Curated annotation (Swiss-Prot):
Protein name: DNA-directed RNA polymerase I subunit RPA2
Gene that this polypeptide is encoded by: polr1b
ZnF locations on chain (C4-type): 1067-1098
Provenance organism: Danio rerio
Catalytic activity from the UniProt record: RNA(n) + a ribonucleoside 5'-triphosphate = RNA(n+1) + diphosphate
Assembly information from the UniProt record: Component of the RNA polymerase I (Pol I) complex consisting of at least 13 subunits.
UniProt KW keywords: Chromosome, DNA-directed RNA polymerase, Metal-binding, Nucleotidyltransferase, Nucleus, Phosphoprotein, Transcription, Transferase, Zinc, Zinc-finger
């Protein structure tokens, strides 16, 4: 990891790059800060498909079974994922497939997974067969991607962005991102108290120690140790979504061939004086003896006999082998030897008893200290392992279904059999396309949906925030408790306190800070135990110089290494930290070193914990004692003293210092100018609104075929911006416009956050934008089974004359209106032509048309991709916002001649109502207005990084002096003249330059009007929904408004006459709406004879009356009658 990247942060923003001589020429290298934003995604995927795939192959056990009395064994030897390419039989100059082609053709960017499968009969190897297991989705810009390592110039040649970041998958032409999810910290025993544990069985208490055990290839399993009210401990684990319980004594006895006394001595370490605990340990060992399990072999046979029915192992496995399988796959699976598992279970038992007796505190499972992140590579690898195991099972089932023919198995027959195995392609595409996990084991996860989201390219800021977002999990969204949503102090510097949505996902969907990274590499730690012992740590089976109660247990990645004395521990920590920072003794730079001290009262369970595992969050700070930068973790940070400013540093107390005062903000939050002068909710709103801005999301519009893209036609570089704006080169993808804003209540059209825009500014293109919509037209789907259908029109067809070209497609640049011919196709066999007409109400311009071929590049072209451009000038009702959460809608386009003007004759672009400031307290916007004004007068670009100004160094003084030097008022006000009367306004008006954003919420997308139209078939009421031209909902609030205005009879028209008025017949005597029916005519009646309506209950017709009722009421009465409930009407 490069720790020097934050040293060269630009401090003074500049506009020089806007007038560079070499503008438009691609740079030699991509911007490192922009590429770092997706590093967690790409690094984890690279790790998964290289080293991780090898580990998966090693970890998958052989599939062994009986066939015709022979023992068949199938196992993977090697697996490799190739780079994306077309099949060799196709017509193409280059076999490589690039992401732009997959987006255009709406297909998946994928590559072939090939495995070497070894098979043997009765233990005799029969050879290795190379087998394709399917097509795997490939992450863009990863090592397997064809874009990997390309320069910006080469990326442009392949129709990508010069700053293409990657980090996503392309499934059916749509860019999908695997979400970063919060998971419990791996291989760390957490003390939890949950009342629902009591319902697990008789004697269970709420106390437990929970551990999420994770192997090197990321296979995870959750294991609990439960405390029972009789003082014994029960081990609980999940295997194939089933819950199993095992008394602790059996687990310990099965792991090591120790005597009961040796096990007893290990368990009571540090608690030798606690007689209750010693009696509990004796009782747990006595339970094992009562079952006749006196030795390790007997315990293994005992467990294997009881568990083998659930393990699905070959019938020739002995009970002992079954028990070993159980211990390997279900107990502390992150540890490789049984002795390590034994020591870890003993440590967890000691912690459980300390917790049950209130000697240590409960650990908050919602605290970031005990969290890590589920990365895309981790999920990809876990899912791949399960599906490869499933492939072996499918081959076994295919062999068992094979008819019992004479003759044995041959390499040819096995190859045919392997081809019948389950293909992995659909499973992976389903996972990425829907985000739903179809798994038999659950992969140790808390949710099986919402794992993937679309990488929405609404603008650059929204796009990058997808890769920095960390979600707590779908399971917590349904909880009524608010504890999971709270911002805890431990998250300082790792999770942004500002960048979280308001509303339902608040506090659950968080974003990593700009300095936060996720550890991806897996580093060998085999040398660390020896290093620890050389520093003064005693081995787990050794004897320290002091009593165990005066020592700390040392845990490295969930393995008990040994014990360290209290007095020696601080020096061990200091030495390890020095090795870590200086890169000595093979200590990884991302190692987390945590010493939880003994406090003499109930606190966290003391110990020396070392973490080198991947998927943890780390960030960069400055180590004051060594004068270098250091990566620290969340758990580690709690026990460090980190200062922010120089004046806060105390010698001997402060150990580290923040690199910048704004280190605790996310990338998006750092784009807010002067955010330290705003109220915090306004900064939260701005983080959301900057992701809804109509901006410039990409440069390759002509090569894209997204369903919908927005484009701001007149973007500008902000005159006032934080340092991070230039650090991430946001000027390449601008999101707004500098506007002259006057704070004045000039008309009545700017109340309640509305704003007035100068009509002449609007005519000059202020905030003008357009929407690009793409439609895929596939003739093979429209007319299935007919290969003679192609695009085209009949020559001389008057319907399409001048509208469609000879190929049946519209002209590039032509305007399409409702009812215009859109495209035509013709049958080469019959000569019959069809024309499809444009069905949308909004007119558009045909921007470009792409012709798509099939996989092999053969056959007639039947698939096109039409991109149309819809111009969107701002209209009344469109939403705008400043960068300070001050959102409002355009209420009126005011003529320039009626706008107020300054002494120099300048008219503002926007009139902002001054009532928007007092309650919102967005002082940052006032400062930006003054700063923007001084920047435009002096030709400068001001730094708006938060915490730059303070009470000693006032922003008002700084920008006021600049305004004064330019000949303007110190406080940013000016004398304005009325545009109506020409007279000078009495008050001084605050006027300046503010960067405004146009949001994507436009009236053109939302307005809805209807007179008559579609009705619901069941209720006969007008249908809802804009797409079906449905009615507008008339709800309770609208009803109350009419009542409050004293126009209650209008409700009769709105809710009855214009809704579902119908005529019904009711019996006056019995009040029934259902019983009046037309009498059934006898056969000899003529068709013209009048039939009477008779009540079936009263058997007479003179009591029938016609009434007007809502149709839905008739439906409701019929539904109640079906439930044997009678409705009686009182008709007068």
């Amino acid at each position: 990891m490069d720790l020097s990247k934050w040293c060269n942060l630009k401090t003074e923003p500049s506009l020089k790059h806007l007038t560079e001589a070499g503008f438009g020429v691609p740079k030699e290298k991509q911007s490192v800060p922009v590429q770092e934003l997706v590093k967690a995604h790409i690094e984890s995927f690279d790790q998964a498909v290289t080293d991780g795939l090898c580990r998966v192959v090693e970890a998958i056990p052989p599939m062994e079974f009986l066939y015709k009395g022979d023992r068949i064994s199938l196992s993977f030897v090697e697996a490799i994922i190739h780079t994306p390419s077309v099949s060799k039989g196709g017509i193409s100059r280059d076999l490589r497939v690039f992401p732009a082609e997959c987006r255009g053709r709406r297909c998946t960017y994928r590559a072939k997974l090939v495995a070497d499968v070894s098979w043997s009969v009765n233990g005799v190897p029969k050879g290795i067969i190379k087998q394709s297991l399917g097509q795997m989705p490939i992450m863009v810009k990863s090592k397997l991607c064809n874009l990997h390592g390309l320069s910006p110039k080469e990326l442009l040649e392949h129709h990508e962005e010069a700053e293409e970041m990657g980090g996503y998958f392309i499934v059916n032409g749509i860019e999908k991102v695997i979400r970063l999810l919060i998971m419990p910290r791996r291989n760390y025993p957490i003390a939890v108290s949950r009342p629902k544990f009591k319902s697990r069985g008789q004697g269970y208490t709420q106390y437990a120690i929970s551990m999420r055990c994770v192997k090197e290839e990321h296979t995870a399993i959750n294991m609990n140790l439960h405390y029972l009210d009789n003082g014994t401990v029960m081990v609980n684990f999940i295997y194939r979504k089933e819950l199993f319980f095992l008394p602790l004594g059996f687990a310990l006895k099965a792991l090591v061939d120790y005597s009961d006394y040796q096990i007893y001595q290990e368990l009571i370490k540090g608690r030798e004086d606690n007689s209750f605990y010693k009696s509990c340990v004796s009782e747990m060992l006595r339970i094992v003896m009562d079952q006749g399990c006196t030795t390790k072999i007997k315990v293994l046979n005992y467990l294997g006999e009881r568990f083998r029915v659930k393990l699905n192992l070959p019938e020739w496995f002995t009970h002992e082998q079954c028990a070993h399988f159980l211990l390997d796959e279900c107990l502390c699976i992150h540890l490789k030897t049984d002795v390590e598992k034994f020591y870890m279970l003993c440590l967890m038992t000691r912690k459980l008893f300390s917790f049950a007796k209130q000697e240590c505190m409960e650990e908050n499972p919602d605290s970031p200290m005990f969290h890590e992140v589920l990365t895309p590579g981790q999920l990809y690898l876990m899912f791949l392992k399960e599906k490869m195991e499933g492939w072996l099972v499918s081959v076994k089932l295919a062999l068992e279904k094979k008819p019992q023919r004479v003759g044995g198995l041959t390499p040819d027959s096995m190859t045919k059999l392997f081809n019948m195995g389950t293909d992995l392609t659909k499973a992976f595409e389903y996972l990425l396309a829907t985000g739903n996990l179809m798994s038999k084991t659950g992969l140790g996860m808390l949710q099986n949906s919402g794992l993937c989201v679309v990488a929405d390219k609404l603008n650059f800021i929204r796009y990058l925030s997808h890769f920095r977002c960390v979600h707590r999990g779908a399971a917590f969204a349904k909880m009524r408790t608010t504890t999971v949503r709270k911002l805890l102090p431990e998250s300082w510097g790792f999770l942004c306190p500002v960048h979280t949505p308001d509303g339902e996902p608040c506090g659950l969907m968080n974003h990593m800070t700009a300095h936060c990274e996720i550890v991806a590499p897996v580093y060998p730690t085999s040398t660390l135990p020896g290093l620890l012992c050389s520093l003064g740590v005693n081995a787990a089976d050794g004897n320290p110089g002091q009593a165990y109660s005066d020592c700390y247990p040392v845990i490295l990645d969930g393995a008990m290494i040994g014990w360290v004395e209290k007095e020696v521990a601080p020096s061990v920590i200091e030495s390890l930290r020095r090795f870590k920072v200086l890169g000595e003794k093979k200590v990884p730079p991302w190692t987390e070193i945590v010493l939880v001290p003994q406090t003499g009262k109930a606190s966290l369970y003391p110990g020396l914990y070392l973490f080198t595992t991947p998927c943890r969050m780390v960030r960069t700070v400055r180590n004051l004692s060594l004068g270098k930068q250091e990566l620290i973790g969340i758990f580690e940070q709690v026990y460090l003293n980190v200062g922010i400013f120089e004046k806060e540093i105390e010698d001997g107390v402060t150990t580290h210092q923040e690199l910048f005062p704004h280190s605790m903000l996310s990338v998006v939050a750092e784009f807010i100018p002067f955010s330290d002068h705003n109220q915090s909710p306004r900064n939260m709103y701005q983080c959301q609104m900057s992701k809804q801005t109509m901006g410039f999301p990409l440069h390759s519009y002509q090569y894209r075929s997204d369903n919908k893209l927005y484009r701001l036609q007149t973007p500008q570089s902000p005159l006032v911006r934080p340092a991070m704006y230039d650090h991430y080169d946001v000027d390449n993808y601008p999101i707004g416009t500098n506007a002259i804003v006057a704070v004045i209540s000039y008309t009545g059209y700017d109340m309640e956050d509305a704003m007035i825009v100068n009509k002449s500014s609007w005519e000059r293109g202020f905030a003008h934008g357009s929407v690009y919509k793409t439609e895929i037209i596939d003739l093979s789907e429209k007319v299935k089974g007919d290969d003679s259908i192609v695009f085209g029109v009949k020559p001389g067809d008057p319907k399409v004359m001048g509208k469609l070209d000879a190929d049946g497609l519209p002209f590039i640049g032509s305007v399409l209106k409702y009812g215009d011919p859109f495209y035509g196709y013709i049958s080469l066999n019959t000569g019959q032509s069809h024309v499809y007409f444009y069905k949308y109400q909004e007119s558009c311009v045909v921007d470009n048309i792409k012709v798509c071929s099939n996989e092999t590049g053969t056959g007639r072209f039947k698939r096109i991709c039409v991109t149309s451009r819809v111009p969107r000038n701002p209209t009344i009702g469109d939403k705008f916002a400043s960068r300070h959460g001050q959102k409002g809608i355009l209420s009126r386009l005011w003529p320039a001649e009626d706008m107020p003007f300054t002494e120099s004759g300048m008219s503002p672009d926007i009139l902002f109502n001054p009532h928007g400031f007092p309650s919102r307290m967005t002082i940052g916007m006032l400062i930006e207005s003054m700063a923007g004004k001084s920047a435009s007068l002096h030709g400068l670009c001001h730094d708006a990084t938060p915490f730059t100004f303070s009470e000693e160094n006032s922003a008002l003084e700084h920008f006021g002096e600049l305004l004064k030097a330019a000949g303007y008022n110190y406080y940013g006000t000016e004398r304005l003249y009325s545009g109506l009367s020409g007279l000078e306004l009495e008050a001084d008006i605050f006027i300046g330059v503010v960067y405004y954003q146009r949001l994507r919420h436009m009236v053109s997308d939302k307005f809805q009007v209807r007179t008559t139209g579609a009705r619901d078939k069941v209720t006969n009421q007008p249908m809802g929904g804009r797409n079906v031209q449905g009615g507008i909902r008339f709800g309770e609030m609208e009803r109350d408004a009419l009542l409050a205005h004293g126009t209650s009879f209008l409700l009769h028209d709105r809710l009855f006459n214009c809704s579902d008025r119908s005529v019904a017949q009711v019996c006056m005597d019995c009040g029934s709406l259902l019983s009046p029916l037309l009498e059934k005519p006898p056969p000899n009646w003529s068709a013209t004879r009048h039939r009477k309506t008779i009540c079936l209950l009263c058997n007479k017709s003179d009591s029938i009356e016609t009434v007007s009722v809502p149709y839905v009421f008739k439906y409701f009465v019929a539904e109640l009658a079906a439930m044997n409930i009678k409705i009686k009407l009182d008709v007068k």
